[in-house]
């Protein structure tokens, strides 16, 4: 059997903290949230645009 490698670099290396999705990731300010989760949580984080 082959050992499963973890992705070390590139777009698939990071995932959303809430749902684990790897696409549409917002890494700015160390958020590591996908865009869908960010929209749900943005007001709690203090982003005024999404109040």
From Swiss-Prot:
Cofactor comment: Binds 1 zinc ion per subunit.
Alphabetized PROSITE patterns for the sequence: RIBOSOMAL_S14
Residues annotated as signal peptide: none
Cofactors required: Zn(2+)
Matching InterPro entries: Ribosomal_uS14, Ribosomal_uS14_arc, Ribosomal_uS14_CS, RIbosomal_uS14_euk_arc, Ribosomal_uS14_sf
Binding site for Zn(2+): 16, 19, 34, 37
Keywords: Metal-binding, Ribonucleoprotein, Ribosomal protein, RNA-binding, rRNA-binding, Zinc
Gene3D superfamilies xref list: 30s Ribosomal Protein S14, Chain N
Superkingdom of the organism of origin: Archaea
Biological process annotations from GO: cytoplasmic translation
One MF term in the entry's GO annotations: zinc ion binding
UniProt GO cellular component terms: cytosolic small ribosomal subunit
Matching NCBIfam families: PRK05766.1
Known role: Binds 16S rRNA, required for the assembly of 30S particles.
Quaternary data: Part of the 30S ribosomal subunit.
UniProt family annotation: Belongs to the universal ribosomal protein uS14 family. Zinc-binding uS14 subfamily.
Protein name: Small ribosomal subunit protein uS14
Source species of the chain: Archaeoglobus fulgidus (strain ATCC 49558 / DSM 4304 / JCM 9628 / NBRC 100126 / VC-16)
Lineage: Archaea, Methanobacteriati, Methanobacteriota, Archaeoglobi, Archaeoglobales
Gene (UniProt): rps14
